[in-house]
């Protein structure tokens, strides 16, 4: 956890400072500062509800978000995609939540260290928003993912995050099936 956050929180205690901070800082930093208190609260909730491993996961998530500030968009996309792909194990909702379909919050996904494709996508989408990528550049996209190899005809419903650098641009795809963030045209499996 950053040592600058306690000082920032004290500074942010006045409404004048809050207004100035939001006007003077880039949107991404302002977003993370505002979210900082919520992430601190999430860490406490994770510790209380799910234990110390879950709290550590939230701390690591926060550190990754802080490290992403100031990076270019491609670095931020890759960092967030890799963070969740390495930390979260894919599993079905019926095994994790004993429900046929459950869309978990990032806290729930990190706390269980498991999720299905929607949980990966929601956590990545929320993370990108927390570091200042506007919602107008992001989409949760349902696709059919080809499974079983290159020649397979089998497919299943799947969710990914699409990042649109400009409104007309081809989206870059963040996915739990393939670690590399690629343009949609380089994802023939979807």
Roles of regions detected by a PLM:
Residues 17-30:
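Bacterial N-terminal signal peptides
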Residues 10-15:
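N-terminal Sec-pathway targeting helices
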Residues 2-5, 9, 27-190:
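A structural boundary/capping signal
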């Amino acid at each position: 956890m950053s040592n600058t956050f306690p000082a920032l929180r004290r500074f942010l205690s006045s409404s004048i400072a809050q207004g100035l901070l939001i006007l003077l800082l880039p949107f991404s930093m302002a977003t993370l500062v505002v979210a900082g208190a919520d992430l601190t609260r999430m860490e406490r909730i994770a510790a209380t509800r799910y234990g110390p491993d879950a709290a550590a996961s939230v701390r690591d998530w926060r550190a990754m978000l802080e490290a992403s500030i100031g990076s270019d968009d491609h670095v931020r996309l890759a960092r967030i995609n890799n963070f969740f792909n390495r930390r979260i194990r894919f599993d079905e909702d019926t095994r994790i939540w004993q429900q046929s379909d459950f869309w978990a919050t990032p806290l729930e996904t990190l706390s269980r260290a498991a999720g299905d494709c929607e949980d990966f996508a929601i956590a990545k989408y929320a993370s990108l928003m927390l570091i200042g990528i506007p919602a107008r550049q992001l989409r949760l996209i349902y696709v059919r993912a080809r499974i079983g190899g290159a020649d397979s005809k089998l497919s299943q419903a799947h969710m990914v995050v699409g990042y649109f650098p400009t409104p007309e641009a081809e989206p870059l795809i963040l996915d739990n099936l393939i670690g590399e963030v690629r343009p949609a045209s380089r994802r023939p499996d979807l």
